[in-house]
Amino acid sequence: MPQSPFFFPDTTVLINMALLGYVDHLRAFVQGRGRWCSTIAWEWRRSRDELSLHSADAAVRATCGEVLDPQDREHIDIEALLTSMREPGDPPNKHRGEAETLVIISNRADLFGRLRDKTRHRGTGRRG
């Protein structure tokens, strides 16, 4: 179990820090504990190219560290969470990065140890 939890920045954080030139500040804050899921890494690459943020790419990759891919069983939970997050008319992949990150964090004890609300029923806020 890690001494301190990993930090999972989302794409918006990465873009904003890159636009402001503050990725090094984020890296100092994360202190080597950065991680990102494959969808967030893909979203970063797409945004990097669209917004011409290539100069920040190496720092973002160093900040985020290892890319974590969903395991087979996690894909089912990701799709279920995506379904609950989507609004009518949303593109199919809207919120995929958030859903993937949440599922990976909640399913992998090695990232945060035992999560207190792991027994919480999805979408109800109830335990049990």
Language-model region placement:
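Active-site-proximal, substrate-binding regions of enzyme catalytic domains
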Residues: 2-111, 118-128
